[in-house]
Regions:
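Acidic (Asp/Glu)-rich catalytic clusters
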Residues: 2-6, 26-32, 51-74, 100-110
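Hydrophobic faces of well-ordered beta-strands that scaffold small-molecule active sites
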Residues: 8-15, 35-39, 68-75, 114-116
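Short beta->alpha connector loops
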Residues: 16-20, 43
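Residue-level recognition of alpha-helix initiation/capping sites
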Residues: 19-20, 53-54, 97
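Active-site acidic/histidine proton-transfer and metal-coordination neighborhood
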Residues: 23, 62-66, 82-128
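Glycine-rich, proline-tolerant flexible connector loops at the mouths of alpha/beta enzymes
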Residues: 38-65, 118-125
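Aromatic-lined carbohydrate-binding surfaces of glycoside hydrolases
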Residues: 77-81
Length: 128
């Protein structure tokens, strides 16, 4: 029985470019033949609160200039100040607002998915 293999797409995750201008990641993705960008949502490129305040115009410009879609947004949220697995109820609620903003931003540039991972609750916290 012949099995068909789904077409593979390769994305460039921008976290490794955090010490470079974001445009460098888009330029490299285009130059090296990547299919899409997985945009890391941390400083200095795509931090959720900054994008909420400034808008997504710069990212839209890069998408258009390099014809390189953002197919996944990965907001930074496993460290201070946002980690929904640690802290008190206030921190949890604040983290939820942050992640809701991230979902809205993901939709703003048409990315079909947002990736986030479970944070760490800490070794001394009682979670029973």
């Amino acid at each position: 029985m012949e099995r068909k293999v789904a077409e593979l797409e390769l994305g460039l995750f921008t976290s490794g470019y955090q010490r470079y201008p974001l445009e460098q990641a888009f330029e490299d993705a285009s130059r090296f033949g990547y299919d899409y960008i997985e945009l890391w949502g941390g400083y200095p490129h795509a931090y959720v609160e900054d994008l909420t305040a400034r808008g997504v115009g710069e990212i839209d410009r890069l998408i258009q200039k390099y014809r390189m879609p953002v197919k996944c947004f990965t907001p930074e949220h496993n460290g201070y100040p946002f980690n929904y697995m640690a802290g008190d109820e206030f921190q949890w609620e604040r983290s939820m607002v942050y992640l809701e903003k991230a979902i809205e931003l993901t939709a703003a540039w048409g990315a079909p998915m947002m990736l986030f991972s479970a944070g760490h609750a800490g070794v001394s916290d009682d979670r029973t």
